[in-house]
Amino acid sequence: MSSRHRGRSLALMCLYQIDLVGTDPDRAMKFDWYDKKITREEKDYAVFLVKGVVENRKAIDTLIKKYSENWELSRISVVNRCILRLSILSLQKEPFLAAPVVINEAVELTKEFETEESAQFINGLLDAFYKKEILPKEPH
């Protein structure tokens, strides 16, 4: 498993705690709840993602609502919301990462923590977001 994938997994677990039980973000990002060894690179990447989502959550949630077609944010599972949040952040703030890689990572995380059906939903929403919000702004 790549360090970026582990970092995304850690970020997802942090965001889940923050969203579901209201854990303070700084407390969650200490990772003292995680019982496996974490490299500095994995932790730094997870912290980057969590801080980015926390700081931009309202704007990201507005985008999720826009592209989730007939789904209220509250109807989307906590795991799926968190995956969407960190993936939209990556698409917006990490232009050096290829969009298909970010979207594939989101799909893989969804398969790992949710269902195949959820993975299709995540893939469709992120693809639509990318094509309408990111792709038109990329240099051609």
From Swiss-Prot:
Entry keyword annotation includes Transcription: yes
Gene Ontology terms describing biological process: DNA-templated transcription termination; transcription antitermination
InterPro entries: NusB-like_sf, NusB_fam, NusB_RsmB_TIM44
Pfam families: NusB
Keyword Repeat: no
Family (UniProt): Belongs to the NusB family.
HAMAP family (UniProt xref): NusB
Protein name: Transcription antitermination protein NusB
Organism: Leptospira biflexa serovar Patoc (strain Patoc 1 / ATCC 23582 / Paris)
Lineage of the organism: Bacteria, Pseudomonadati, Spirochaetota, Spirochaetia, Leptospirales
